[in-house]
Amino acid sequence: GAPEISEFFKFFVETARSAGARVIDRNNLTIIEEDGFAYLPEYLAEHEVEIIASLPCYSAENVNKQRGNGVFDKSIAALKKLNAVGYGTSLTLHLVYNPLGPTLPGPQQQLEADYKEALQENFGIVFNSLFTITNQPIARFAEDLRKQEKWDWYLDLLANSFNASTVEGLMCRDTISVGYGGEIYDCDFNQMLGMQITNGNQLFLWDISPADLKDRAIQTG
């Protein structure tokens, strides 16, 4: 998705920043190359919005295979524009990697080094950090796993690769996901599954305060 498409995007950014809040834009990069959105690099820089951007690989072949023809070139063009206004140096620019298909990502530190070397040498692009994400078996990915008859195999892979040291840092422990209608979820994965936070009734953003969420049980699927 592209949150920048929302007619309320600027309102959210400016209201949150004026209140002193830290704002992070989960950016797909290609939006910057679409008609009507060329203003984004300068706008985001002006409001000191941190960017976490999707780039599933540093090679054109793999990116285009996962996200469609032409996506890699658009992503590189967008990254250059972000670098030009200070992202990756004075402003925060992180990239996100997730593997293609039912495999686990490689070691994050090594992948980050590989990304930085390839993007700097080939395109003169810099960024701050790389985050690796494991593909969750939900929505379209779940459908693909079943079609490939790899559903059980992938669930076994996830179970056998469980890392207890990651539990403390799970985003659902300190973050909620909000739907376009004000629905609240423990995380974006639960949002995809329609698992709205409840207290017997479905809850919306205007029904709660931060204190209401403290020590509550996180829903799992």
Model-based region annotation:
Residues G1-I5, A16-G36, Y43-L79, H94-V96:
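Core AdoMet radical
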Residues A38-S54, D114-L130:
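Structural recognition of alpha->loop->beta junctions
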Residues Y154-L170:
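Short, basic/aromatic recognition patches
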Residues V178-G179:
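Short, acidic, Ser/Thr-enriched surface-loop or helix-capping motifs
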